[in-house]
């Protein structure tokens, strides 16, 4: 099985060390463009663009990277409760059309009550997943070309439709990650690829089996992906030294503040990440070559695969054997590490190198009439 390898655009900051200004670097459009173009040339399938108040807007960043890349895909967040599904469907179709079919979408429900309140969202965990399920139903149906009437608990639309369809059919793939039961049920019923954070293989296997069984109950099959950091060097010793350097400027106060911030979220996945290290620096290798040091101060994906190319490739293949075909990777700093992963790791894997998409012909059309329909040429009999 060929593997889809993704990289990451660090729109929330970048540097050589975690939890300090030491070794940090400015992240501007030029720097993000360097990373995107490196990923494009090295054969990554795409890049994940993060979302949240600590990040630049993912949609605007993705749109700005389309003209400077050729085959790279952009995995961009959909935010139920923050955005209406009809607006999100129009945005998704436009991004897919402008990128010539290089748009992917990541459903993000949110987990920090404080940040959500700042966005005007006051739903609890269960309610957010109810709203996300309704959002996804409407979003998918619009991209499938339906005219949608929907009267849900959280979302109400009447006569919603999409005049400009996406390039990818039936619609651009939808990714999603969540560890709670309601999250897994949403994934099983509606998404195309389920993402998990980088837990030890036995825990990932358990989660995949749960989601796969729930999908089968809906008569569906879905794909699986994993989100990991990577520290790869020419030797294992060099890789572990690099891992230690990454947290060499961390103090206990910074770790405690970060863990307190993570604790206020209601994310089951974040709780599982925190349990891998319990905020302590000792015994961070939680599984062979799987290191939890990143999660001491970084929310979300908090583990890294550490080693030389063959060693890290062996660990990746262990995850692939569980049914994972997509790996969303990152490393600090992201420009240099994109090259290290491409040069030291990719040669030891069966990497699916994406082709440059050919321009897709669009149907001739006139100007939309009264914001309701588009006149099209009628075939002569």
Curated annotation (Swiss-Prot):
<keyword id="KW-0503">Monooxygenase</keyword>
<protein>
    <recommendedName>
        <fullName>Alkanesulfonate monooxygenase</fullName>
        <ecNumber>1.14.14.5</ecNumber>
    </recommendedName>
</protein>
<comment type="similarity">
    <text>Belongs to the SsuD family.</text>
</comment>
<dbReference type="GO" id="GO:0008726">
    <property type="term" value="F:alkanesulfonate monooxygenase activity"/>
</dbReference>
<keyword id="KW-0285">Flavoprotein</keyword>
<comment type="subunit">
    <text>Homotetramer.</text>
</comment>
<dbReference type="InterPro" id="IPR050172">
    <property type="entry name" value="SsuD_RutA_monooxygenase"/>
</dbReference>
<keyword id="KW-0560">Oxidoreductase</keyword>
<keyword id="KW-0288">FMN</keyword>
<comment type="function">
    <text>Catalyzes the desulfonation of aliphatic sulfonates.</text>
</comment>
<dbReference type="InterPro" id="IPR011251">
    <property type="entry name" value="Luciferase-like_dom"/>
</dbReference>
<dbReference type="Pfam" id="PF00296">
    <property type="entry name" value="Bac_luciferase"/>
</dbReference>
<dbReference type="GO" id="GO:0046306">
    <property type="term" value="P:alkanesulfonate catabolic process"/>
</dbReference>
<dbReference type="InterPro" id="IPR036661">
    <property type="entry name" value="Luciferase-like_sf"/>
</dbReference>
<dbReference type="InterPro" id="IPR019911">
    <property type="entry name" value="Alkanesulphonate_mOase_FMN-dep"/>
</dbReference>
